[in-house]
């Protein structure tokens, strides 16, 4: 998935940096200069506010997931880039939406019809409760996501 997205991003004209560490912070807000320096010292490459939850939920739903992190600004550690201005972020965000659409259009053409990755069975060992002790109501509510394990 990641390789296909990287190829599609390059094909859409994006500058691509495969890999990296994503730091999820509480938002909506911009980092202070001290926070920004701390995140850099930890080795964070991208700072955002939503990706952690999305990645966890995708794993729990056994959905293949990869991040396309389209930067809107340099965090405030980069003194030469100046302070982050909301108007600039909104403009770049708008451009990034169009770029993301091109990337996704290019990527979906190359996805295999069947998956053979571990994502499809990520929950196979997650249920510890004896199956007989799982109430009918809970089974019904969870059927869509974990029905194959019940």
Question: Which residues make up each language-model segment?
Answer:
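Glycine-rich phosphate- or other oxyanion-binding loops that anchor nucleotides, phosphorylated ligands
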Residues: 1-79, 87, 91-94, 104-108, ...
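Short, conserved interaction/coordination micro-motifs, predominantly
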Residues: 100
